[in-house]
């Protein structure tokens, strides 16, 4: 039974009203959908080469194939979980689901090319950076820019409002309220720029990163070029030399950038709390709300 009151974390319990938009990116359902997306696009890319055995897949089938992730349902995700209860392997369960779907689309003779030559981390290490990159672009950065615009607007509005600055909790020298707000504008702008400079890296190269199975099966194909082009088509950057897994360095860099932005926002909140305690500002009262 699904209910917010049964959540084990306040993130998707008490605070669900503000975090629910992220479920399209970070829920297990979303992860499964992104895995399906990568598998489908990979299958289509193999058809586009084409691999000899896939030359018979009509281009008209691509739209229906893409509907497997654009119209992916909760019921589809639940079926993946049912398959996983037997396989005890989450990515293999996605592969089996897609084979069922291909059979339903009349493409049963091509089903064994789903996940051809790949290891699970080829899917995980593309689906994960992809969902994170799209969550940042669709949700996080628009919200952050909205906040930044508000802070900048207040800084402009209060540009010439004088106030007494403090250091070490004691009165120091005069300043302007607008200038104090522009401190946060500058800090946020710099960190947003740094965040957006981080490339979303993906790993895609088979069991140990060298496309070994691919080369054995089709030595005439430049699989490194294929992998680079495929990952680029997803809006990601392929790591050229890997083991079975992605390096995760850029993923760590992204989270570190988010941490720095959160630190700035914490500083902003603490300054506002201080200004309220000094009666420079007063909290807005909402009818019906109680407490501090």
Labelled PLM ranges:
Residues 2-211, 218, 222-229:
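A helix-coil-helix interface module used to build multimeric assemblies
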Residues 48-55, 107-108, 141, 157-160, ...:
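Intrinsically disordered or highly flexible coil/loop and linker segments, enriched in small
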């Amino acid at each position: 039974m699904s209910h917010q009151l049964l959540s084990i974390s306040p993130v998707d319990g008490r605070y669900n009203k503000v975090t629910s938009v992220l479920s399209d990116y970070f829920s297990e359902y979303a992860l499964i959908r992104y895995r399906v997306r990568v598998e489908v696009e990979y299958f289509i890319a193999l058809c586009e080469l084409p691999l000899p055995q896939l030359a018979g897949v009509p281009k008209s089938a691509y739209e229906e194939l893409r509907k497997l992730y654009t119209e992916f349902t909760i019921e589809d995700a639940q079926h993946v979980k049912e398959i996983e209860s037997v396989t005890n392997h989450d990515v293999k369960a996605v592969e089996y689901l897609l084979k069922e779907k291909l059979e339903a689309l009349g493409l049963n003779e091509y089903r064994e090319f789903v996940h051809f030559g790949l290891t699970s981390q080829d899917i995980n290490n593309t689906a994960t950076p992809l969902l994170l990159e799209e969550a940042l672009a669709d949700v996080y950065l628009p919200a952050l820019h909205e906040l930044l615009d508000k802070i900048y607007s207040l800084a402009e509005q209060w540009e010439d409002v004088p106030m007494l600055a403090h250091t070490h909790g004691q009165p120091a020298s005069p300043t302007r309220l607008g200038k104090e707000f522009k401190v946060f504008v500058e800090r946020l702008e710099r960190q947003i720029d740094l965040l957006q400079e981080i490339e979303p890296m993906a790993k895609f190269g088979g069991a140990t990163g060298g496309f070994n199975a691919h080369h054995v099966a089709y030595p005439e194909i430049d699989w490194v070029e294929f992998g680079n082009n495929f990952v680029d088509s997803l809006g990601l950057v392929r790591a050229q030399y890997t083991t079975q897994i992605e390096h995760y360095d850029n993923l760590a860099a992204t989270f570190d950038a988010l941490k720095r932005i959160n630190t700035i926002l914490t500083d902003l909140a603490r300054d506002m709390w201080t200004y309220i305690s000094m009666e420079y500002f007063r909290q807005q009262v909402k009818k019906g709300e109680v407490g501090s």
